[in-house]
Amino acid sequence: MANGGGGGGGSSGGGGGGGGGGSGLRMSSNIHASHLSLDASSSSSSSSSSSSSSSSSSSSSVHEPKMDALIIPVTMEVPCDSRGQRMWWAFLASSMVTFFGGLFIILLWRTLKYLWTVCCHCGGKAKEAQKINNGSSQADGTLKPVDEKEEAVAAEVGWMTSVKDWAGVMISAQTLTGRVLVVLVFALSIGALVIYFIDSSNPIESCQNFYKDFTLQIDMAFNVFFLLYFGLRFIAANDKLWFWLEVNSVVDFFTVPPVFVSVYLNRSWLGLRFLRALRLIQFSEILQFLNILKTSNSIKLVNLLSIFISTWLTAAGFIHLVENSGDPWENFQNNQALTYWECVYLLMVTMSTVGYGDVYAKTTLGRLFMVFFILGGLAMFASYVPEIIELIGNRKKYGGSYSAVSGRKHIVVCGHITLESVSNFLKDFLHKDRDDVNVEIVFLHNISPNLELEALFKRHFTQVEFYQGSVLNPHDLARVKIESADACLILANKYCADPDAEDASNIMRVISIKNYHPKIRIITQMLQYHNKAHLLNIPSWNWKEGDDAICLAELKLGFIAQSCLAQGLSTMLANLFSMRSFIKIEEDTWQKYYLEGVSNEMYTEYLSSAFVGLSFPTVCELCFVKLKLLMIAIEYKSANRESRILINPGNHLKIQEGTLGFFIASDAKEVKRAFFYCKACHDDITDPKRIKKCGCKRLEDEQPSTLSPKKKQRNGGMRNSPNSSPKLMRHDPLLIPGNDQIDNMDSNVKKYDSTGMFHWCAPKEIEKVILTRSEAAMTVLSGHVVVCIFGDVSSALIGLRNLVMPLRASNFHYHELKHIVFVGSIEYLKREWETLHNFPKVSILPGTPLSRADLRAVNINLCDMCVILSANQNNIDDTSLQDKECILASLNIKSMQFDDSIGVLQANSQGFTPPGMDRSSPDNSPVHGMLRQPSITTGVNIPIITELVNDTNVQFLDQDDDDDPDTELYLTQPFACGTAFAVSVLDSLMSATYFNDNILTLIRTLVTGGATPELEALIAEENALRGGYSTPQTLANRDRCRVAQLALLDGPFADLGDGGCYGDLFCKALKTYNMLCFGIYRLRDAHLSTPSQCTKRYVITNPPYEFELVPTDLIFCLMQFDHNAGQSRASLSHSSHSSQSSSKKSSSVHSIPSTANRQNRPKSRESRDKQKYVQEERL
């Protein structure tokens, strides 16, 4: 068998030298017999292809040449010469000579250049001096030869620079050519690496014919390209030395020259071609050039993977080389046959420190390399692999892009995304009472959701999707398809410690979204009223196109202010704008009637053409009696097509075609009756459920109509100026103005602000409104509003202007304004005073709401309402303690005791009575805000409204209730009674505004007292109200509706109070006085047969027609402005229109005989009261 191999070797060597070759090969066959079978097939093919002797010599025996070739070590096939000499050193030497030769030349050039610079340093200085000395003769042309020489040098430098710049452009990724070249080089490097993987199955060194080996030809073409690219890089390099030592350069040194050597020697050496794997490190750069990688996480992930894999493959290539070759000092005798992929496996188990032992290094070089590699490899494995797994695990969970569903709209919700905010939003947005919610909700937040929030998303997976990202990043906005979204809703953190910072964050979100897509509709929550002005600075912000800012401070304090005028109104309004399911209770308890009202919400619908030409009260009565709907407002188009929302406008206004009505109903389907109603078809129908689309309506629908389904839902194109009133004079016979000059006095006196919407006075210094405790006690305040405020110099501002403005609305006469007394820290109130100094009848008592002496000084037992606010709530981390100050103050007031005799004495003394006010008994007024008990001897009976941050803290306000701590806020007794208010109830306004943008306008009209966009722009400029002269235009703005409470105990409706029907009261009040009733404020225990001492009341919203009334009920109503209330209060009609805020003191004729005896008392006191209050208004 050995002799046959020798013959083959001789044949390959050529001619008669075959025998010698065979004998030489037989010696090595005795040593490596165990490895010979691996190369049998390859040696035979190589032998036959390279033979140049006679055919008989090459084909004498087929079996023996194979066996003779198998004697050669696995590192080489049949040698390409007669001696079987290895040539690996030639390949390695080519790389070493190239590297060190080039390095030597670079260093030599630098040395010579340095020496030249040092030697010529003095000569250079002499030339510079010569230039300076000859500077004056330059104009005469004496330096022309020098100039020509300098130009030649400059041209040479310019040519070299141009070549260098051209080479830099060619390899730069800034240009298209450069990017193509860079990507091509990387792709060819990977191709060369693949060729290495293919060749690794062959012996380390083998004979190859360049003209017949296809892979060698491809590899040669690749390396020629690498050589050209290397030249470009060398030319473009600024520092040639550092370029020579770069990793990519070293890769080229050890891979390119050996290919040329292999062509020359007609043999191949696998060698260091594995270094091409180091090119994988640039993989992330290539993907960035192609704009495939854009996020930091993806770039980091690809970087880690490329470094890890390139290091792994390169190290495996080195082990493969040394293990298959053996140690040179051992004459390559200790080699072992390992495939490249076995080496890859070996390196992985080595890095992971597992080390199974099935594959291991035998050579000294291999083991020495493993010793050093295991140190770095272990560190890399331990750090890179966990990070890679973490990036892969987190990357795809909430990444990706939103895929829009055809025929289905989607909205984007961002901002403060937490379990509480999202659950409240989804509960209201996806409520079953909403008609056909075919909207998908896409949440975008930069923090991944926790487990609870994730579970919430999964429960609503059919309509909710979450994506991790930021609205400040245009890439993330593109992912959620913001350009095709129906709207973008931004939630605010109501409990943040710095409200201004939170508002600034949301304003930046608005700017980012509008910058990306100016036409997107945005609804955002704002915490502070003064920050709304910054939204006006955004060019693409347009409230006419549906953009809205829901200011929580403005609405929260507006709700509370309305409760000062009609206690319980805050609860009723909050329930109307929230979606609540109907909860049926069979037992005859107060909860039964309360929950029946809670199920009512606010809806809009276009009115049927059957109502065209009818007056508003007529349509309102018809809707209530026949359709079982309560209409409280309409959208009115004036002659110039300007749209306004009018609340209970009165009988002078006629319904137009296409009028939008605002209804209170239990669901959206009921409101459709107002659109489907037809007098011809439905006039005799008694069951409102049978009022459906009739044949007449179908004929109308076939004709062109201006009412689109989208308008019915959102009415986006008919945005009106919020709170603006029609500039029309009332023509109701009961409301004919007598002599306006009596009430408005001299038109040259500024009594109202420039818009005519609020009472105004000249700015006052805070020192002039501060009362000491003794001054407050001597003043004997009565029928006023006490505002207990907790705050200090470092507290965030609440924005008390939003509380005062509704109480100073111009649709009150001056004598009807309630005096406001602030009790709190003077340091805090000084910070708020700049926004309050233009309002009349405001006083400050420095102190603390927890001091009973301060509370007694302001006669808290005689106040119409006590408001408890805190500016320190968000500075406490423990949510259960956030409301501690308000709760303590409330409990403190409720535990106070008062002497009735002192109260009666004070009420009849020369105490506080603003000019023109009647001191009549409040208990017999037909219209008043809160039916005061004959006397208050305990603090429990004092009307209080407490602001809470944490809903669960409501359980601490009433010690005698049985509310469960887990009960929702709207189901608790304090909220139902109107004695507690939490800002969380305003969350529902986000979804309500989205579905109907007129809803926010309506609620702001109701609670702010008449704030308009013009007024907001003015406040944004000056941060204060500007006084204006009384003109017919501004005075016409006073003619608007307001909320009041109607007492049934006595007065024109006393006959209905005892067992009458609510529907009869509704119709009588509407027909007789244009008063629109919409709810009842009833004693909690009124349903009990036995009399109770409990004075707590609860709210009943929109009771049915047949609902039975009791004498102690107070009726919520929308009252017209009474022009004559400022002149005369001697008629019944005027008393029915007097304000509930002034009814406790004046503005009505009462039925008790003692009234006449008291009529002269205000006149006798007027001069004394003016000294303290009227004079303040004129300062």
From Swiss-Prot:
Segments for region (Segment S9): 780-800
Region span, Disordered: 1-62, 702-730, 1129-1179
Region (Segment S8): 614-634
Binding annotation for Ca(2+): Q955, D958, D961, D963
Covalent lipid sites (S-palmitoyl cysteine): C119, C120, C122
Positions occupied by motif Calcium bowl: 946-968
PANTHER family registered for this protein in UniProt: CALCIUM-ACTIVATED POTASSIUM CHANNEL ALPHA CHAIN, CALCIUM-ACTIVATED POTASSIUM CHANNEL SUBUNIT ALPHA-1
Protein name: Calcium-activated potassium channel subunit alpha-1
Origin organism lineage: Eukaryota, Metazoa, Chordata, Craniata, Vertebrata
